Amino acid sequence: MELKSSSNNNILEQLRNGFARFELVSSPTASVSDSISSTSLPASFISTTKGNSYVFFARINSSMNRSPAAKKVEKYAVDRVKGDGRCLFRALVKGMAFNKGITLNPQRERDDADELRMAVKEVICNDPKEREKYKEALVAITVDESLKRFCQRIGRHDFWGGESELLVLSKLCKQPIIVYIPEHEHGRGGGYGPGFIPIQEYGSEFRGGWGKGKTNKNVVRLLYSGRNHYDLLR
């Protein structure tokens, strides 16, 4: 039981911090559904249709870890971000401004970060119709808390952003985002190299293209440097 709890906690931590993404898998067959105890899953993961029990569960999406790009160490400068609970949002607004050749002053950075936070709240909490466009984010949110609880907390400046907010903002802003970790945290021989390893990408569909409705935006690169803190890479 302790081993199972530890494993579940590890998965939840990866999802909260953006290291993992949900891949929804369902099984309408009794042989599979019955083998998974409903007591081990949140109630929101289970539904019944025409007598069949459908079990929806999270599978870690490790596509970046399998890709050649994920094996490559990349070098960037670290732009430190204030750790006041807004770090994810601050890093994003700084990165988007930097890509446009704009430098934000401290007050503008804070205000823009708070606007991003409230944009997440607006589409997820205040507009049920819009909410349906962000199903992956909804699953990431409700894996360990209710939507109501999330909506009570997201408006607070000290509520950290993570996986669900990245899923929303990459789509809402049509902004490609890649999250990195320091090279030494990737377990490469236990060394402390100066590079960074990409672990997850959001909004890849907005990285380029031509034609009506297409965008070609520069990537915003975020460094997850532990303890729920994000900095900007550039």
From Swiss-Prot:
What keywords are annotated for this sequence in UniProt? Answer: Hydrolase, Ubl conjugation pathway
Q: Which family does it belong to?
A: Belongs to the peptidase C85 family.
Where, by residue number, is the active site? 84, 87 (nucleophile), 229
Q: Which InterPro entries match?
A: OTU_dom, Papain-like_cys_pep_sf
- At the top level, the lineage of the source is Eukaryota
Cite the residue spans of the region called Variable-loop: 154-164
Instruction: State whether keyword DNA-binding applies.
Output: no
Instruction: Describe the reaction catalysed, as an equation.
Output: Thiol-dependent hydrolysis of ester, thioester, amide, peptide and isopeptide bonds formed by the C-terminal Gly of ubiquitin (a 76-residue protein attached to proteins as an intracellular targeting signal)
TM annotation in the entry: none
Q: Mind telling me what this protein is named? A: OVARIAN TUMOR DOMAIN-containing deubiquitinating enzyme 3
UniProt region (Cys-loop), positions on chain = 81-87
* Enzyme kind, highest EC tier: hydrolase
**Disulfide bonds, paired cysteine numbers:** none
Q: Which residues form the OTU domain?
A: 76-234
How is activity modulated by pH?
Optimum pH is 7.
**Any one GO molecular function term:** cysteine-type deubiquitinase activity
The protein's job, in short, is:
Hydrolase that can remove conjugated ubiquitin from proteins in vitro and may therefore play an important regulatory role at the level of protein turnover by preventing degradation. Cysteine protease with a preference for 'Lys-63' over 'Lys-48' over 'Met-1' -linked ubiquitin (UB) tetramers (e.g. Ub3 and Ub4) as substrates. Also cleaves RUB-GST fusion.
